[in-house]
Amino acid sequence: MPTLTVFTPAYNRAHTLGRTYQSLCRQTCKDFCWLIIDDGSTDNTRQMVASWIDELMPAADFAGQCDAGFIIRYIWKENGGLHTGYNTAYANIDTELCVCIDSDDWMPDDAVEKIVQCWEEKGSSRYAGIIGLDFDTQGKPLGGFFPDNLLETYFLDLYIDNIHRADTKEVMRTDLMKQVAPQVGFEGEKNFNPVYMLLQVCDNYPLIVLNENLCIVEYQQDDSMSRGIYRQYMNSPHSFAKLRLLEMNLKRNTFKHKFRSAIHYVSSCVIAQDKQWLSQSTHKVLVLAAVPFGLALSIMIKNKAKK
């Protein structure tokens, strides 16, 4: 059995998934398999994946070895949003480690080799996994490199201690992710960030720091992305409220950041028209103190989402 599963949730990404596939074919270490979770695509994703393993009559689920020497597994599911793709992945992964590579991203040629070597040398039950870097298409790490003396870290500490604020790439122990999966969402809401599961695990276990490029992303920070997050706040308020509740309960969180989460929690509850907003929280004083700020934030979000 391989050490690593690379899993890719995809929805109508046939036009970018081939690039991800080619990067996996170029890997200098083939100690991995690729799991594709098709979230109800209506394009030719299934047929394209089938062609890579010479599957002539692809069913909803199939698997086979591609010419590059690694196993590809394909699972089709009804469209349900990103977190349901993660749920399906964790239910079907049986390797020691797993990492998500999005359908419009790709891996540098030696990424798997670096992951496997790092885990063989440093991995143990003490760690949740490995944290590495995302690079942009110009060859620069998002948010810069980690400090040279940072050998391990808790995920939340990167943000709280202002060590690294940009996206990173987490390679997780599968057994730990299975303990917190599935992530139960809300009917009609498809924007429940799978970081919800990651935070639960990484509040108790540190990550080994691998100061290397593990994923290349086409990262663009523009107005459309900003508007997109406001629309997500509007479209999935119960999901965001649940995430903020978790953030307030994380033992590694600080009062400052718990209060920030409380503000966002109030805002999400206002948008969701959730009358149980106070009774659901175990930090009632903090939430009550955040009410005026949360009300103001909800108004701002509603206005931003309309633009």
Show where each model-derived region lies.
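Short, well-formed alpha-helical segments that are part of the catalytic scaffolds
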Residues: 13-26
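A conserved acidic beta->alpha catalytic loop
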Residues: 23, 38-48, 102
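Short beta-strand/loop segment that forms part of the nucleotide-sugar
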Residues: 31-40, 73-78
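Glycine-rich, basic loop-to-helix element that forms the pyrophosphate-binding segment
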Residues: 76-93
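Short aromatic/hydrophobic "clamp" motif used to bind/position activated sugar donors
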Residues: 98
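Conserved donor NDP-sugar-binding/catalytic core segment of glycosyltransferases
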Residues: 110-144
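Conserved nucleotide-sugar donor-binding catalytic segment
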Residues: 140-228
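C-terminal subregions of glycosyltransferases and related glycan-biosynthesis enzymes
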Residues: 211-307
